[in-house]
Amino acid sequence: MSKKIKYVVLFVEGETEKEFYESLIRFYRLKSKNAITQSKVFNVKGISRFEKTVTSKLKIEVLPKFHNSEIEVVCCYDTDVFELAQKPPINWKIVRKKVNDLGINSFHEIKAVKMIEDWFLKDIVGLSQYLKIDVPKKLEGKSGYEKIKTLFKKGKKPKVYQKGSNTHKFIPDLNIQLIRDAVKDELAPLEKALSVKL
């Protein structure tokens, strides 16, 4: 019996994350010593929509096309909404079970500690170059999101940072290698699923 072809499906919180993960996968394709696994990124459009969207996308868009493939599911999200919430917006055990019920046994979570903006700040030089400002000595704001919003206000072009809006314009200016190296432990399950060898 021939070995099944692998297919990795990423589910992300929003447009900002979709832009970033698509850039990260392009980086892996360029830098990996071997061919990486075929993949697709879906935007679930909000943390609370993972449970419903993951199963419906798998049923309608993935399984009919890749029913003979070994499918791996990767859910990528920010941890900030789980840290202080008395009732978290999503129960990952339920999501995992629903994925398993579809006959998919490989399920991974990629957690951006606090939020993905904290990852972007790992390349403060690239962000500053995009905004045409000097690299700040100190960042203002409590969260990564607030810090990036403050940076954008100082910038020469778009003066407003809004999750999902204009992200495609600054993501190419980011040093993906630098960010990947800084958060490689968090990205390890994704790299394994994609068969990345750097």
Label each residue range with its predicted role.
Residues 1-6, 18-45, 55-198:
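C-terminal accessory helical subdomains adjacent to catalytic cores in phosphodiester-
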Residues 11-14, 18:
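Extended, compositionally biased accessory segments flanking or bridging domains
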